[in-house]
Every structure is written in C-alpha cells, then in structure tokens.
C-alpha cells in the first residue's frame, strides 16, 4: 500500500560502550554510562530494579514527547489525541507512558487533571503477554520515588480515583504494601484490554484481574 512506518530509536550520548565487555558484572548504578546498553538487566537487587525503571522511563518519556511533537507539526488537536493516535502498551514495561503523558499535558499543555486523564485513557490500550511476575510488574513506590518522583503524585492520584470507585483490594493500583501494580494502572486507564493470543486473554479473565467484573474483555 506504499505506506511507510518510521522506527524510532532513542539513545543518550553519555553511554560508554566499552563496558559491554564487562557483561552482567557492569556497574548498574552508573546510569549515564549504561542506560541503553543492556535490555532487561539483572534485577536481582535494588540497583538492577532501579536501572530497569530508569530504562522504562527513558523510553516512554521520549515516546510521549515525540508523539506530542509530531501532533504539533501536523496541527492536530491534542484534546482529540485519540482520534489520531493509539499508544499500545505491550506488557507492563511501557506502563509509565500513562502518568508521563498526563504529566506533560497538565504541566506543559494547560490541561486540567481530569482532561488529561480522559484523553490519555482514550488513547492507551494494554495487551497482556504473559502471567509471569516479571511481566506483570509491581514496583515498590519507594523505587519510583527515587527514579521518577515527578510521576509519583500522578500515580497516587490515579490510584486514589480507583480506590474511591472500587473497594476491592485486588484491583487497586497501589496496594497495602505500597507496591504499584502497573497492569492495574493499564487496565483502569486504557480503552482496551486484551491478550496477545486467546490464551492470554483468558488468563486475564481467569486469574490476574478476577475482580475486574466492570470490564469487558474480547
């Protein structure tokens, strides 16, 4: 059909490729040197978890800014973003796109919180790929406070809105252990939820969100 899609790759100039030879023993705390060198680094300790959060935020923030830049170039109405774009959240790794996009719309684009949440919720969709724990991420709130403190108030607001609407602890974004359930955020603040295959959709129906009776999954 003569259509061409662009593949955008994000990187930072400070990355030190010489540390690749160190393999999995590299210094995970040297974020400016290793941020984009190793995908899914060892997360068996706190430093590895924080690096993953840094990586995820780096990618989603760049993507959010790119989407808004391209919409401005095309003179699209940001308040109808969902008419021009769909942001597909595959697994929970890009889940921070939701609070990040809300943050930018509120801080830089003169949206109210309600307006930003509505637009983002109509633009983002979530696809479950697995039921493995590493895919359905649950980040300690304290980790997010270290890496992305600017997103924490937004995540708390999103969680509070869910808590005001649903009392079931199984569907909360921030649980009683102060862990942020990224999949729950995607489910509550996306317009579509499905599995990458039929079995993954059934997993969503039968296991993880057994209390999401307010949702209709395909």
Predicted features and spans:
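Function-dense linear segments that define catalytic or interfacial modules
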Residues: 3-86
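Alpha-helical support elements that line or immediately flank enzyme active sites
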Residues: 61-65, 100-107
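Conserved small/polar residues in nucleotide/adenosyl-binding loops
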Residues: 213-218
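Extended, well-ordered alpha-helical scaffold/bundle regions in very large, multi-domain proteins
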Residues: 106-156
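Polar, glycine-rich mid-to-C-terminal structural blocks
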Residues: 153-179
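Extended catalytic-interface subdomain
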Residues: 187, 194-196, 203
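Secondary-structure transition/capping motifs at alpha-helix termini
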Residues: 70-82, 105-118, 130, 134, ...
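Core structural elements
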Residues: 88-100, 123-127
């Amino acid at each position: 059909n003569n259509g061409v899609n662009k593949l955008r790759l994000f990187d930072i100039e400070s990355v030190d490729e010489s540390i690749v030879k160190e393999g999995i023993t590299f210094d995970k705390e040297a974020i400016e040197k290793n941020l984009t060198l190793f995908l899914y680094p060892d997360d068996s300790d706190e430093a590895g978890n924080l690096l993953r959060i840094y990586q995820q935020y780096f990618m989603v923030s760049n993507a959010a800014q790119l989407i808004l830049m391209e919409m401005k170039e095309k003179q699209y109405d940001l308040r109808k973003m969902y008419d021009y774009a769909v942001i597909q959240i595959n697994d929970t790794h890009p889940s921070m796109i939701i609070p990040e996009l809300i943050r930018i719309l509120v801080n830089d684009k003169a949206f109210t919180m309600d307006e930003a949440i509505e637009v983002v919720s109509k633009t983002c969709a979530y696809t479950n790929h697995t039921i493995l724990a590493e895919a359905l991420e649950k980040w300690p709130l304290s980790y997010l406070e270290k890496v992305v403190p600017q997103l924490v108030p937004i995540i708390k607001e999103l969680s509070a809105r869910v808590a005001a609407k649903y009392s079931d602890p199984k569907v909360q974004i921030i649980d009683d252990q102060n862990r942020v359930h990224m999949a729950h955020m995607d489910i509550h603040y996306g317009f579509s939820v499905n599995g990458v295959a039929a079995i993954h959709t059934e997993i969503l129906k039968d296991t993880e969100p057994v209390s999401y009776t307010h949702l209709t999954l395909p």
